[in-house]
Design a protein with these regions (language model features):
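Conserved, structured core segments of small domains
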Residues: 1-95
Length: 95
């Protein structure tokens, strides 16, 4: 699998760096991820007008990632079923 992306709020990422893991958001069954060609659509649908966002590039090797269909029919997306180890994030960029 190619690298996958996750859009994170800066404050959430800073907390993850301090603890060593980025947790599954409260109440969610997984961490939502996307492939590079899906990023623009994710930003438009879920983060329009948001600021202080970061693009996390994740090395998927060894992670419990499952590609699943989006509930809204927007396509198949990688979902991380479990917390994200900070060490698996290979690049962080502001959006």
């Amino acid at each position: 699998m190619p690298p996958v992306l996750h859009v994170a709020r800066r404050s959430d990422w800073e907390a993850a760096e301090a603890s060593g893991t980025y947790p599954v958001p409260g109440g969610a069954p997984f961490i939502h991820c996307c492939l590079p060609d899906q990023l623009a659509g994710v930003l438009e649908r879920f983060f329009a007008g948001a600021d202080d966002l970061l693009q996390l590039t994740i090395d998927p090797r060894g992670l419990p990632l499952v590609v699943e269909a989006a509930e809204d029919g927007a396509g198949d997306f990688p979902h991380l079923h479990g917390p994200l180890p900070v060490a698996s994030v290979v690049d962080v960029r502001p959006l």
